[in-house]
From Swiss-Prot:
The protein's name in its UniProt record: Orphan methyltransferase M.Rho11sI
PANTHER family in alphabetical order: TRNA (CYTOSINE(38)-C(5))-METHYLTRANSFERASE (PTHR46098:SF1)
Residue ranges annotated for the SAM-dependent MTase C5-type domain, each copy included: 4-500
One Pfam family this sequence matches: DNA_methylase
NCBIfam families, per the entry: dcm (TIGR00675)
Organism from which the protein derives: Bacillus phage rho11s
Reaction(s) the record says it catalyses: a 2'-deoxycytidine in DNA + S-adenosyl-L-methionine = a 5-methyl-2'-deoxycytidine in DNA + S-adenosyl-L-homocysteine + H(+)
Homology family: Belongs to the class I-like SAM-binding methyltransferase superfamily. C5-methyltransferase family.
Active-site feature positions: 78
């Protein structure tokens, strides 16, 4: 086989095509089908496609007149099966569009197909929807495998679970009963077990492992964002009220000492092995209960805390005792403070200087310091205060920040660096940036939403260049499929099936 001939249905902005391009597959686009005028503009710009290749409304296509092709890609509109779209299924016209996909397979009999849809269809109508779909693929001559894949495992910080169905024409491979991983009991494996009873034509596709969450949300955020994306202080305050306050750390036991021998037990041990006065606790935990009596032969000490030693990182050139020349790291604890605090006798701490907000680079008042270090000495001769850089603020995904009441069940705020909420066409999610409770909350930008679907910056710029508005850019991202997930599927499909057939 020379070039892989591809037909695309329900094309959107062409995630399947972007994935094939990204992994270097030489393919010929024989046609696509899309009815949204803005998506068509973006699609043609991104893929350098002639609009004459658009067959338009899939329900009006004469399938017999379609050109020949090897691979059919697409996912029929998912709103009718999704939780966000209220799950009307085949009762919704959009749900019945699935059968246009089946009719295309039946008439043209391409070698392969890749189909995508929402997780909700697996159990929709008590499993009958998936049963009908799987039986339909079998009836038109395809062996299938299916899997539930989450975008967060494909180098995209978005929690997006979708079902992917791969089909290979039955004359090209032998039937192979599905192997369901032992001990697996999720919704997809249950669905597969149910389908096996229907004698679905099947094979075992090698799916990518889902065990490593790659990129963090902070890695796809734009550095400079227009103020229009930020919520007002009033809205921000109301949202922050919905955050559960961080819990204090528990009392953490780390070891014990023998009062007579003064040794620290570094082995695995338990607090019950030591008397109360001999127990050592982590200083990062909360304090133990204070009592009014002496315990453990240690006078009035009720508990002991393990602390890190001062960390000396250098010397400065001063006259006098060695102790006053030492410079300490802010990562350790302070050395013992003495009453002789003048004449350079105070402890010196290294604080990272990261820049100056004065264009000339001069002036102490304009200096900016890293928040991971300690504050420089505060003085009273300037009223503008010290500028602190926050290099690693919390980045917390926020569900529909512009809505006072959230429309979906579940959390309003995720924890720092968790994957973003699922991008869709209805909800616009956001991020809280800062440290509790001093967050600034904003919406994700259109570019960030495209990045969450793993589209290249160049793809986004091409859509912008043909005049696509922000509202349409959001919609197009929400309607699309995560490109990196499709890349992983195509790599296996091409390597194991397409290339082997060509040899």
């Amino acid at each position: 086989m020379s070039k892989l001939r591809v037909m695309s249905l329900f094309s959107g902005i062409g995630a399947f095509e972007a994935a094939l391009r990204n992994i270097g597959v030489e393919y010929e686009l024989v046609g696509f089908s899309e009815i949204d005028k803005y998506a068509i503009k973006s699609y043609c710009a991104i893929h350098n496609a002639d609009e004459q290749l658009n067959f338009g409304d899939v329900s009006k296509i004469d399938k017999k007149k379609l050109p020949e092709f090897d691979l059919l890609v697409g996912g029929s509109p998912c709103q009718s099966f999704s939780v966000a779209g209220y799950r009307k299924g085949f009762e919704d016209t959009r749900g019945t569009l699935f059968f246009q996909y089946i009719d295309t397979l039946k008439e043209k009999q391409p070698r392969y197909f890749v189909f995508e849809n929402v997780k909700g269809l697996i159990n929709h109508d008590k499993g009958n929807t998936l049963n009908i779909m799987a039986e339909s693929f079998s009836e038109v001559g395809y062996r299938i495998d299916l899997e539930l894949l989450n975008s967060k495992f494909f180098n995209v910080p978005q929690n997006r679970e979708r079902i992917y169905i791969i089909g290979v024409r039955e004359d090209l491979i032998e039937n192979d009963e599905w192997v369901v991983e032992k001990g697996r009991n999720d919704v997809l494996s249950k669905g597969k077990k149910r389908l096996k009873e229907l004698n679905i034509k099947s094979f075992n596709f090698k799916w990518s492992a889902q065990d490593i969450v790659g990129r963090r949300l902070r890695e796809i955020l734009e550095e400079y964002v227009d103020e229009k994306y930020y919520l007002s202080e009033e809205k921000t305050s109301k949202l922050i009220e919905q955050i559960e306050k961080p819990k204090e750390k528990d009392v953490v036991f780390v070891g014990g000492i023998n009062v007579g021998k003064r040794w620290l037990n570094n082995g695995k041990t338990y607090s019950r092995n030591f008397k109360q006065g001999n127990r050592v606790y982590d200083s990062n935990g909360i304090a133990t209960t204070l009592t009014s009596q002496s315990v453990g032969g240690l006078g009035g000490q009720t508990s002991l805390y393990k602390v890190e030693d001062p960390i000396m990182i250098g010397h400065i050139d001063l006259k006098g005792h060695d102790a006053i020349k030492r410079v300490y790291s802010p990562d350790g604890v302070s050395p013992t403070l003495t009453t002789m605090g003048e004449g350079h006798r105070e402890p010196k701490i290294a604080v990272e200087y990261v820049g100056n907000i004065n264009p000339s680079g001069k002036g102490m008042n304009d200096q900016v310091y890293n928040s991971n270090g300690l504050s420089p000495t505060l003085t009273t001769n300037k009223g503008e205060g010290v500028k602190i850089s926050v290099p690693n603020p919390e980045i917390r995904p926020v569900l529909t920040p512009e809505r006072e009441e959230k429309r979906q069940n579940g959390r309003r705020f995720k924890e720092d660096d968790e994957p973003a909420f699922t991008v869709n066409t209805i909800d616009r999610h956001g991020v809280a940036i800062g440290e509790y409770p001093k967050y600034r909350i904003r919406k994700l930008t259109p570019l960030e939403c495209w990045r969450l679907q793993a589209f290249d910056e160049e793809d986004f710029e091409k859509a912008l260049s043909v005049g696509i508005s922000n509202s349409q850019l959001y919609k197009q991202a929400g309607n699309s499929i995560t490109v990196t997930v499709l890349e992983s599927i195509f790599k296996e499909l091409i390597h194991t099936y397409v290339n082997e057939e060509s040899e």
